[in-house]
Every structure is written in C-alpha cells, then in structure tokens.
C-alpha cells in the first residue's frame, strides 16, 4: 500500500487515529480540470457534488474539531469538469477565538464549519452545530457568516431537514450553557426565518441530529452530557460524556402547532448521531436511525459500533416500542431526500469497506463492496441523485460517494446505478488527490 505521508499536512504526531492513513489532512488547496473517468457518466447528471469534513491546519484534540474543508466535483455533459478543495474560511479561521466567552455567552461566528453542506432557497451553507452557518459558492469560495438577515441568534445544527412538500427548512440549535439549551427554527421556501422558539431540556446534551415527519419534528435528548471539567482542562477533547442517570427520551412537536407543547417519550438509553428517516403512520411515528448502545463513557473515542434501529412512538398510548433492524455496523445513513419525512423504502449506509442498501419495507439488504479483502476500500457517505427523466422512483437514479483506494493512495468519485446497486459502478471519476475521510455532502443540481 502507498504511504499517505507524502500528501498529508505536516502536523506533529500526537498518536490520534485521525492523523494517519486517509484520515490525515491534506496540506493545501487544488483545482484540476477535465478529470479522467472510467466508465461513462450519465448525461442527465448536471450539477455539483460537494462534501464537507475536517482538515486541520494545527493539531486538535478530536476528529470533530478540525477546520472544515470542502471537496467538490462539477459534472456536466457526461464529463467531470473540475475537482477542487477549499477550506471554509470562517471568521475564526485566520485568528482563532473561542466558542464561549468568560461569562458563558457564545461567539456564534467562531466555527470550523466542517460537518455538512446544504443548499436551500439559493443559499449554499457549510454547517457545524456549534455556530452559525457559513455561506459558500458552488465553486467552494467562502462568502461569509449567514444569520438569515439577522434573525438567527443561535447555532444551527449540521442536520437540517427540508420538507419535500412545503420546501421549508427545519432545524434546531443547541449549546447554550444556560437554559434554554435548545431552540427550534423554521425557514420558509423563500429563505425567510419565520419561527424560532426555545425547547426545554434538563441539561446541555450533545444533540447532533433530529427527525422530521410530515406532521411532526422529533428531538433526541440523549445521555451524552456537557462536562465542564473537560471543557476547562485544555485537553482539546469533546467536552461531553455519557451519564447513566440522565436517561434518554424523544421529544415530539406538532408542525401545525410550532409553539405548542413538546411531548416527551422515554426510551432505552442510547446515542444517535444520525437519523435515516422518520414518518407518520396514523397515530404512530416511525423513527429509523443508527443507534449506539453506549458512547463516550471514558473518552471521546469511537470504539463502539452502531446498528440500524427502529422506534415506533404511539401518540395515543404514550409508549415507544423499538427493535434492531440489522446486526451490521454502519453509519451515515441517507435516503432519497424527496421522501424526507415520508415512508422511504431504501436507506444507504456506510459499512465495513462497503455501502449497504437497506430495504426498509422487506428488511432485506444488499452490499456494494470496495477493494479486496487484503486492501479494503474506504467509501464515504453516499448521496442519492434522482434521474430527471422517467418515473420518480427510488431506484431510478444514482448514488455518489468518494471512495479511497489504499493501494494507490487515491480517491475516486464513484457513481452507482440505484437499480443495480451491487453491480459495477457506471462511472469512476479519478481525482487528482486523495479525499480524506469526512462527514456529509450533497448533490446540487444545476
């Protein structure tokens, strides 16, 4: 296998996993045109594939805390026009300043903006849950901090939900040291922030994601709780730890009564980084997510694995039933975004050197594997791109993901036919450098 050190940032080695292999940051920004392709890019694809992730310029104490870097490929006319990577130049990029002030208030412009990139109402936003979003162009240049015309006074989750029916953007913020620790917000299809309200929870917990249905939003109040001792220790680690006594619960708010009561439902203790989907089934809410039985009890590491899980919230009886859907360790679940909050049939997650496509209706699953047993490939999160022609079906389109090849120390943008998920990729765009493992991305159609 090829050594990654030659194209990695020259940072002091502190022994953390995210300094090595394809987790290691790249040292600079590139732009390359007319990328070579193996196979044939579908002519219908016209847009930008953009993905966010950490790429620290200085040593950090945790993978989640590196400076955000966007990696993008422009696809048009059956060709890969360009690849480029750019750091998100936040207000704290050149002159770092802390998230919290001495009095406990927050600097919402202090950001690494390293987690997700979404497009809504003509704005492309780089997101991290500790700050305001940062607007970027589709060419990956940073425009600046974006606060919805001065209306947003809280951080914005990196996992907002766009309603496919109304075009509204739903999101929450968290991070206040003092109550209220959580807030809920809604932006209309034109990009105007129309609703902001507090959500009462007992403590500052790490609420990374939430869920949306056609009639509800669901908050995840789980036992990863802010730890002030870690925060002031100077370790640079994530200042959250598992607390048994906190418990776990799901909070349900009706979308047609956004300032109404949040109903809380106790569940078995667990942690959820990422929701696959949720939907209404009569007087029951179905929630599908990747579940950790326990996380961060001793440190902020990733020794525990997660599996796909199902919860059914009965709004009539106030009870929740739950069960495991599969025993494979997976993360980063995605669905066809046209079905967000509706009964989607398929969810695709990152597995062990594979992408796993779950049939949520039948319980079946199919894998697309990368590399060989001796040199397994490394796929990232897969995004579904629906075909602009033909039936609006979850199998009529393509999945895109960056995939790392450890033999050549190189990355490709792989395009899979959704109707032949386990088959050969329809196209593999050869990238001019490896793309470090990161977090989330999106396809933005032209």
Can you name each region flagged by the protein language model?
Residues 1-446:
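Beta-propeller domains
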């Amino acid at each position: 296998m090829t050594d990654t050190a030659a194209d990695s940032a020259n940072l002091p080695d502190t022994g953390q996993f995210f300094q090595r292999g394809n987790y290691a940051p790249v040292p600079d920004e590139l732009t390359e045109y007319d990328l070579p392709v193996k196979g044939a890019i579908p002519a219908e694809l016209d847009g930008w594939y953009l993905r966010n992730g950490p790429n620290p310029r200085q040593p950090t104490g945790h993978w989640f805390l590196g400076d955000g870097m966007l990696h993008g490929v422009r696809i048009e006319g059956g060709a890969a026009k360009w690849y480029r990577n750019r750091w998100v130049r936040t207000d704290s990029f050149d002159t770092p300043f802390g998230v919290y002030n001495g009095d406990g208030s927050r600097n919402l412009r202090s950001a690494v903006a390293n987690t997700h990139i979404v497009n809504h109402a003509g704005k492309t936003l780089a997101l991290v849950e500790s700050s305001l979003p940062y607007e970027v162009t589709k060419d990956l240049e940073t425009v600046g901090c974006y606060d919805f015309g001065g209306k947003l006074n809280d951080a914005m989750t990196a996992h907002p939900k766009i309603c496919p029916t109304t075009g509204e953007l739903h999101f929450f913020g968290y991070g206040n040291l003092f109550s209220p620790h959580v807030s809920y917000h809604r932006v209309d299809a034109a990009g105007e922030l129309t609703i902001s309200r507090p959500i009462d929870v007992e403590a500052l917990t790490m609420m990374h994601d939430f869920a949306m249905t056609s009639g509800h939003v669901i908050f995840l109040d789980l036992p990863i709780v802010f730890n002030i001792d870690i925060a002031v220790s100077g370790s640079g680690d994530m200042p959250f730890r598992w607390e048994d006594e906190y418990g776990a619960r799901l909070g349900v708010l009706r979308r047609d009564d956004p300032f109404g009561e949040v109903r809380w439902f106790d569940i078995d203790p667990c942690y959820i980084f990422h929701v696959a989907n949720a939907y209404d089934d009569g007087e029951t809410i179905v929630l599908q997510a990747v579940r950790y039985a326990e996380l961060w009890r001793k440190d902020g590491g990733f020794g525990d694995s997660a599996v796909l899980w199902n919860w059914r919230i009965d709004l009539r009886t106030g009870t929740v039933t739950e069960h495991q859907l599969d025993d494979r360790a997976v993360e980063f679940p995605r669905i066809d975004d046209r079905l967000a909050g509706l009964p989607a049939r398929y969810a695709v997650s990152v597995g062990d050197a594979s992408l796993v496509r779950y049939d949520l209706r039948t319980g079946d699953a199919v894998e697309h594997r990368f590399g060989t047993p001796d040199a397994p490939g490394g796929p990232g999160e897969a995004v579904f791109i629906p075909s602009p022609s033909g039936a609006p079906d979850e199998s009529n389109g393509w999945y895109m993901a960056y995939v790392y090849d450890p033999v050549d120390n190189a990355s490709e943008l792989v395009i899979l036919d959704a109707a032949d998920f386990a088959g050969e990729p329809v196209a593999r765009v050869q990238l001019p450098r490896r793309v470090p493992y990161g977090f989330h991305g999106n396809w933005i159609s032209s």
